[in-house]
Amino acid sequence: MSRGQTEGSQAMASSQAAGPGPSPDAIVSVSGTVQKYVAKKKKVLNPEEAELYELTQAAGIVIDQEVFKILVDLLKMNVAPLAVFQMLKSMCAGHRIADTVSADSSSISLAPGHSDVRGRNKPNPTTSTTQGPGERSSREGSSQRIPRQPSGSRMQKSSSSGKSSGGSST
């Protein structure tokens, strides 16, 4: 037998003699690793971000600190909130599909997701003053696109029927 095999067999014999549970040395090293991980995780957020993170938890939002840090960094870089939301939605799409397949209720679980998106885009008198400029500009852009389509249809209608109300000249 080689020296490595002898040490391995001695370690196995000592662990069997100690009992079926893990040795105290293993527990100490695992708890030390966990403590290092927790300390590292706590250092992820600066004090201001940590306060925001605590507020999100108080609001009932469960999110990993590292994911929260990424979101905060994106928003600090002036990435549009809608773009961040769409990115998160696309990243989570795989998880939702797996969840719905396991639950066998794909139509029920997908329906609230679509209604949430539509509900957020509706103008709300209480939140209309707090909306960011990105959301307003997207609404303005869509309102600019809407008149182009009816103008083409008006011209087709007026040329086909030969009747014109004359109101479109102003």
Swiss-Prot record:
Its main location: cytoplasm. It comes from the Eukaryota. InterPro entries: MOZART2. Residues 123-132 have a biased composition (Polar residues). Residues 8-20, 151-170 have a biased composition (Low complexity). Residues 1-26, 102-170 are annotated as: Disordered. It holds the Pfam family MOZART2. GO terms for cellular component: centrosome; cytoplasm; gamma-tubulin ring complex; spindle. It is found in: Cytoplasm, Cytoskeleton, Microtubule organizing center, Centrosome; Cytoplasm, Cytoskeleton, Spindle. Keywords: Cytoplasm, Cytoskeleton. Belongs to the MOZART2 family. Part of the gamma-tubulin complex. Interacts with TUBG1. This is Mitotic-spindle organizing protein 2B. It comes from Xenopus tropicalis (Western clawed frog).
